[in-house]
Amino acid sequence: MPWKQPHRVVRRSVLRYILRAMSESKAMILGCAGRSLTRDEARFYRGEAPWGFIVFSRNLSEPEQIHDLVAAMRDCVGRPDAPVFIDQEGGRVQRLRPPLAPNYPSAAALGALYGDDKAAGLRAAWLLSRLHAIDLGRYGITANCLPVLDVPVEGANDVIGNRAYGRTATQVAALGRAAADGLMAGGLLPVMKHVPGHGRAQADTHLALPTVDTSLADLQRQDFAPFRELADLPIAMTAHVIYSAIDPRNPATTSGKVIEEIIRREIGFDGLLMSDDSSMKALSGDFSMRAAAILDAGCDLVLHCNGDMDEMRAIAARTRPLEGVALERARRALASASLSDHTKEDDLRAEFADYLGALVA
């Protein structure tokens, strides 16, 4: 049927354009300062071509504004598939709030339900992520930094706390898998975090660099286990945590030993590895040094969140193009996002309400 041929040509042309554009991207994910791009931000993004973007509550006010912001970001880099990330976990970490999206329960609430009824907990975790995919997808946001696979221990800093699915590796892995599956069923990319485990940290990495002195055997048994179980996920985010049994000098994010020996080999993760936010105080040095250290250690992407233009310029100055195996991992990650569940939104919300509706506002 000859009328199909032009469509094939167009599809091939678009695919070549996207692949070429991605190959010209820099290995970084950046935020912006406000609810629309300034001229300086737009000019900077066009010139530096970040692979992806991340948005926070400060960037989000109403539906049309969010659509316009996300479209402007993608327009700057010339890639309609440029991923836009967000932290939309539920509980206290939720960038979209009413009326843009409901207030959802925390991971700990899912864990409590799982403790009473495993099947119900798993289904609720899947449903919550499927609803996240609906909420985010309608604004053009395509990646959610979820599931949290950290296993907190008694006495650890509360930065993880009720963001965790439980206090055993088995429960965290099971609910994390359900959450990741729910996102992917809705066409969103999941990002497991904070590899290889943030649950023992005695400090909030937004403010300080924690050191974990636990033995390698205990880390392997508990902390690494959920990440090992979900090592097939497309994207992971590192922890700004020192594990003295592995590398007593460098946090995982800038430790070649942790990334190569633990994340890549021990855990078996061969997907796209992004840093946690490079503007956190857990990291030291100027921002160009941070970017270089992150990439030299083996991360595929540098994440910078706060939208500070001077910091972003310094990050970009030492960030190399996304190429080689990192580019292939990025392509695989984007290709893994495909809407497969077509259940009506009202039905999904009604079913979730049967489990944890009293905790949704």
Where are each of the predicted segments found?
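Extended, intrinsically disordered, low-complexity segments
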Residues: 320-361
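Glycine-rich anion/phosphate-binding loops
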Residues: 61-68, 115-134, 169-174, 219-220
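Second-shell residues forming the walls of enzyme active-site clefts
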Residues: 30, 59-78, 82, 94, ...
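Glycine-rich, aromatic-flanked loop segments that form ligand/cofactor-binding clefts
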Residues: 77-105, 125-151, 172, 180-196
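A charged helix-plus-loop insertion that forms the helical arch/lid used to bind
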Residues: 100-119, 164-166
